[in-house]
């Protein structure tokens, strides 16, 4: 039985990761920021941890909540979205919300969680996956749609790639879920939540040291550029 940690699991992709890993017989620890989200996690049989990734004080206490754990697979799924383009200056509130959740939360989690992932499999190490977006790919930008969101996810990719050398036993990747039918992706998206998460789970199982620090699609294939 593997130990799986899902950070940002109250709904959508995060909740589906919890559902699928629990169905596979894995032990799952998962975070949510409110009571309703925590109850959804408990209903799936997960160990629910209260955490608000947009609040640095909340994230700073993650390590003691995970004390003694060895994590085979950790996933940072938490994220917020904005559609605003470059024709409108981002507000301070919008910028701070996206950067705190999408970037700072992940950067705070890495030093607390990565050492626990390194201890997995009798010290051989596990996998730490950060859910990013294809909209972060600088080499294929065709629009400023989601301007601040794009910037935040590109920053997340760099946070992952630059943290990787400090944790040689851990395979750290930034993985896009694809265009998914969630509150963020909309009803017209190509993939259901179930399809996206199933594909990502297969890709995660197939990760090897050659993938360290990589920017991957939901099927595990690398993007053509950063």
Segments from the language model and where they lie:
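C-terminal helical subdomain
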Residues: 174-177, 186-226
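Conserved glycine-rich Rossmann-like NAD(P)H-binding loop of the short-chain dehydrogenase/reductase
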Residues: 21-39
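Rossmann-fold scaffold of SDR-type NAD(P)-dependent oxidoreductases
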Residues: 7, 71-79, 130, 173
């Amino acid at each position: 039985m593997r130990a799986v940690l899902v950070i940002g699991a109250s709904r959508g992709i995060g909740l589906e990761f919890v559902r699928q890993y629990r169905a596979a017989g894995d032990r799952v620890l998962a975070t949510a920021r409110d009571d309703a989200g925590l109850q959804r996690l408990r209903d799936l049989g997960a160990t629910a941890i209260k955490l608000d990734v947009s609040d640095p004080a909340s994230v700073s206490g993650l390590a003691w909540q995970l004390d003694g754990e060895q994590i085979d697979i950790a996933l940072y799924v938490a994220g917020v979205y904005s559609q605003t383009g470059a024709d409108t200056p981002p507000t301070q509130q919008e910028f701070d919300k996206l950067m705190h959740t999408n970037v700072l939360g992940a950067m705070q989690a890495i030093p607390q969680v990565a050492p626990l992932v390194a201890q997995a499999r009798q010290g051989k190490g596990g996998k730490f996956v950060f859910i990013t977006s294809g909209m972060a790919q600088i080499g294929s930008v065709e629009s400023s749609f989601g301007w601040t969101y794009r910037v935040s996810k590109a920053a997340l990719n760099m946070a992952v790639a630059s943290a990787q050398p400090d944790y040689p036993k851990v395979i750290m990747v930034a993985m896009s879920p694809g265009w998914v039918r969630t509150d963020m992706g909309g009803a017209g998206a190509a993939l259901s939540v179930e399809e996206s998460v199933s594909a990502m789970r297969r890709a995660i199982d197939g990760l090897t040291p050659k993938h360290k620090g990589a920017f991957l699609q939901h099927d595990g294939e690398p993007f053509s550029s950063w």
